[in-house]
Amino acid sequence: MKSCKDFYDDSAQMWADNWYEDETLLPYLKSFLEHIGKKSPRVLDLCCGAGYESMRLKKLGAKVVGLDFSEKELEIAKNKNPEIEFHERNMLESYKDLGAFDGIVCIAGIVHLQGNDLKLAFDNMADVLKPDGCLLLVFREGTEIIQTTTYNDVEYNRNFVYHSRENILKAMNGNFEFVEELQSFDTWKYLFYKRTKKSLL
């Protein structure tokens, strides 16, 4: 069975085709930048995919760095946004070398994580987010876990994990504080958190 990374490599063009023209998340990105409250803030688009929200953040005035583990999605991101800095890396690997950020956008980035991996993901975010920096976290709320995904008649080992807010706060290990919930769609939740402890950088 093919891997989660294979899924995003194989479906990269589909995501780009769907989301470069879809501005559903634009109001959330605007609100995110308002929460940061700085001119030209430095923002990490974590699990940026093909770069569509990186593009919008830049148009809104942010200095954007995108990070994703899909080589194919990043090829599209770089071709469409040559002025944005993109890095191929797993969110479970340290990225402290990228420097400190005023804000992090993580849209659906944690939907494949649970247990210690989820804790590690938040630890890595905390390592680079400045004190009182803003995190926009988008995830599906619940207890369901979908084990596999089929795309173009190919099956992928792509765990899709729903999360409770309590489990997320536990995994954050005191490094983040809940600030506000924006209007959500169905089980998709759009939540703002801020960095509470001193950055390790």
Language-model-detected regions and their locations in the chain:
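A short acidic, Gly/Pro-enriched loop at the edge of an enzyme's catalytic core
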Residues: 96-104
